[in-house]
Amino acid sequence: MQAIETRDAPTAAGHYSQAIVHNGVVYVAGQLPIDPKSSDRTVGSIEQQTERTLRNVEAILVAAGSGLDQVLQMTIYVSDIELWGGVNTTYARVMGAHRPARAVVPVKDLHYGYQIEIQAIAASK
């Protein structure tokens, strides 16, 4: 197993790695829409939060030698299912033609008042 840490995504805030690579698979820990450069925790629109979170996932995947086009499955936690339209539109734009398996999990609350958290599993290139 290899732990992945990159400055291009938010530093892990607890006892975990940003990702683990094992047997050619990258397991990305749940990511929030925190700006890795400034650690800014400003909550923007759901579209802004979704894009920032996906970019954090992407940065970790790249550090692991993978990318969004190698994602096998994503789990998206959203604080209000009514936000799904904005999440899905942004997700489709960022992911492009690649359509990995996906689960959407409505939850009551997420850290720091955010409305989205994304976890991913990807193949390494």
Where are these regions (language model features)?
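Short, polar/acidic, helix-capping and beta-turn segments at strand->helix junctions
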Residues: M1-K125
